[in-house]
Amino acid sequence: MAAEENTTYQEIYDPFIWDRPTHFNFANDVIDKWASKDKKKPAIFWVDDKGNEKSRTFTDISTHSKKISNALSTSGVERGDVVIVILGREIEWWEIFTAVLRMGAVISPGTTQLSAKDVEYRFNAAKATCIVTNFANAAKVDEIAENCPTLKTKVLIDGSVDGWLNYSDLLTQFSDDFPDIKTAADEESMCYFTSGTTGYPKMTIHNHSYAIAHQVTGPYWLNLGETDLHWNISDTGWAKAAWSSYYGPWTCGATLFIHHGPGFSAAETLSLIEKFPITTMCGAPTIYRMLVLEDLNKYDFTGLRHCVGAGEPLNPEIIGTWKTATGLTIRDGYGQTETGILCGNFHFMEPKFGSMGKPAPGIHLAIIDDAGKEVSTNTEGDIAVKLVPEKPQGLFKEYKNDAERTADTRRGDWYITGDRAYADDEGYFWFVSRADDVILSAGYRIGPFEVESALIEHAAVAESAVVSSPDDTRGEVVKAFIVLAPGYKGSDELSKELQDHVKNVTAPYKYPRKLEFIDALPKTVSGKIRRIELREQEWNS
């Protein structure tokens, strides 16, 4: 499955054809096959911030998931039911994920940062019948349980609470003799709640065939094989965990490195890379921005051979700093909760710093105009995926119970991602902005990413977010919210210096006419900057 290092992009992309089985179940067809191939094959190496270590083989994952499938079935969870899982990076998350897929139910992962109100909304929107969480989150579930009429089963992985089943007891009480459920490839398997710019979070529904899309993610983007130890630094409630902490690595038979702790520490992350034989790594741009603020020369990166980033574009300056210290290029990849990987700097191609890369094998990706026509090179437009003659694997089924918002993602024969970009003469895609993040100032269209990339080249800038701000003359102007690097203080002089810096680095009309120094940027649980929050703050003030 993996490409040889001397293989060219076109040699992989041109002949690629998706597998399209009638039936597919990742638990049966992938997990169990690795387990039968080698009963001791490692699947997970887990550590926490206290130094505790655990491991699981594919046999463990297979056996434990069969027991949990039996337990959930006995407690009333049926095929097609939605099971909400709210856990951090506890090792049980991977066993439960597999168990739910195995029994033909629908898994709906959520972050531990959800409030009781958030949980209530998810239960009632999805008509979920089961919740699996930990002791720390049990109270918020019990607070709203009586408002959730479909809730039948509550499972706790630690501690003891009245009305909850104990996970460890279930592993002891139930057999690992669970029949293979022959799920159809187009049968529902996952439900991710994803926020839009308006309204409640959308229920993004994927089928079992979604997993097949990661036959591209694992070998081609993550560059994984059976002997790799892969670390994806991601919250389990984010779809990126499905990409790079589950389907992608385990498709390739790689071992997952999981670090469970209360929060992110750049210094600790670098120490773990040095201490353990981690070979490949995936992180959000925010992770890399924080890592490069450390003294990278203090650490040994000889075991690390491949790094990727996803979530939003990574600034060229950060990629260059990381490469100087580690010898490795962070290879950006692009996709969404609604898709598998659509575009990337794959290991068999030469990357361009700051580029999204080229279309993924199996994906007809293009830049189109408002009429659904492909535009010429170096012309900005909407990033779109061709749906004919066949829809590519990994593309979501629908936004559940929301036909209007589902329809809004279609333009003729295209799926519209909601992102803007252009493609250069060599076929590399370059991100401009979310369609709703574009700044229109005095007739100019300005993407926030290019301004942020210019700002971060200045030593004083640790992070920035650029949004539109109202202006009587220009209609709107560029405003930059800036988190300063250690040792710098905000001042009028520094503001002027940063404005001049942007004018020198990029087209002068793009410079931020307004700047504000802040302690931290608002972000999603996956580390994406919430520009919409800053933009609304500007326009509503």
Residue ranges and their predicted role:
Residues 39-42, 156, 162, 172-193, ...:
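Conserved pre-ATP/AMP-binding loop-to-beta segment of ANL
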Residues 40, 44-98, 115-120, 166-172, ...:
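Conserved AMP-binding/adenylate-forming core of the ANL superfamily
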Residues 54-59, 189-213:
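Conserved AMP-binding A3 loop
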Residues 74-75, 98, 102-169, 183, ...:
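Structural core segment of the AMP-binding/adenylate-forming
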Residues 114, 121, 129-134, 281, ...:
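AMP-binding/adenylate-forming catalytic core of the ANL superfamily
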Residues 192, 251, 278-283, 292-352, ...:
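Gly/Ser/Thr-rich phosphate-binding loop
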Residues 212-232, 236-279, 294:
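Conserved AMP-binding/adenylation subdomain of ANL enzymes
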Residues 362, 373-408, 446:
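Conserved ATP/PPi-binding loop(s) of AMP-dependent carboxylate-activating enzymes
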